[in-house]
Amino acid sequence: MAGIVNVGVQMDHVSGITIAGDSTFAMSLEAQARGYRLFHYTPDKLSLRDGRVYATAQQMQLRDVRGDHFTLGEDERIDLSTMDVILLRQDPPFDMAYITSTHLLERLHPKTLVVNDPAWVRNSPEKIFVTEFPDLMPKTLITRDPDEIARFRQEMGDIILKPLYGNGGAGVFHSARDDRNFSSLLEMFAQMFREPYIAQEYLPAVRKGDKRILLVDGEPVGAINRVPAEHDSRSNMHVGGRAEATDLTAREREICTRIGPALKERGFLFVGIDVIGDYLTEINVTSPTGIREVKKFGGADVASLLWDAIEKKRA
């Protein structure tokens, strides 16, 4: 393959991001520094006609300046097969709109390298993919059956109940064995979600943090520890979690070694896994975050390592 000139960035609109913690911004900034031309578009601007995939896009220039971080050019209708690389970076929810975009991008890959591979993104939902490694996980139940969930809670004691396709800590509940609101919680989930939900044993180690580990082409390259707020079980930064520097433990390296081959096999060049204590809880392949935080705490320049891996794939 030839080198990289044009990079499409499929993302939520650049005007709405917070650059201090946005991994898509970090990835795009590194691409710009390498001399690539960036083309910005949102998923709703994708089209398929006569077997070709188009997007209404704008050339994008970035600056690492809060409040003045981007300039967009005029709208252009672009045949996405003219892109060398496309970054698939819109945030979940992992709904039919998201799934449809992966079908369209699959028409382009691998001649145009889509990061991550859209077919495998579609076939590897983050809270289901992880169940391929049951010995690395906490006890987990995926179901919509309230009786099954009640039995699971009786067995486990405290549990976490969360949407199967949510993100950012939204809709995550900690329910104790004696929770009087448990029936109401199940009723609320039944009304809100048509698909199954996920129940997981509560891990007290979350009070010490939920570690986000970043992997490039199956190899761990950096990590941060996300500590939840005092009265919250969620460590996501969106809901008040606090990031801190960390190193990988022997157990965490073992987890990375176990899952690395599966990530490489599926073309996942950039992945973020979540580990609580000794347990793997999620494998994030859609739009993982953490690049800027790792660098902020003196860790690797993950965006640079990622583009090194992309260039190697394109060579």
From Swiss-Prot:
Give the co-factor note. Answer: Binds 1 Mg(2+) or Mn(2+) ion per subunit.
Q: Which SUPFAM superfamilies match?
A: Glutathione synthetase ATP-binding domain-like, PreATP-grasp domain
Instruction: Indicate which residues the UniProt annotation says bind Mg(2+).
Output: 282, 284
Q: Which domain of life is it from?
A: Bacteria
Q: Which UniProt keywords apply?
A: ATP-binding, Glutathione biosynthesis, Ligase, Magnesium, Manganese, Metal-binding, Nucleotide-binding
Annotated GO molecular function terms are: ATP binding; glutathione synthase activity; metal ion binding
Q: Which Pfam families match?
A: GSH-S_ATP (PF02955), GSH-S_N (PF02951)
- InterPro entries referenced in this protein's UniProt entry, alphabetically: ATP-grasp, ATP_grasp_subdomain_1, Glut_synth_pro, GSHS_ATP-bd, GSHS_N, PreATP-grasp_dom_sf
* Enzyme Commission no: 6.3.2.3
PROSITE patterns xref list: ATP_GRASP
Q: Which residues form the ATP-grasp domain?
A: 127-311
Residues forming coiled coils: none
Gene Ontology cellular component annotations, sorted alphabetically: cytoplasm
Classification via NCBIfam families: glut_syn (TIGR01380), PRK05246.1 (NF003573)
Provide the protein name: Glutathione synthetase
Q: What is the lineage of its organism?
A: Bacteria, Pseudomonadati, Pseudomonadota, Alphaproteobacteria, Hyphomicrobiales
Name of the gene: gshB
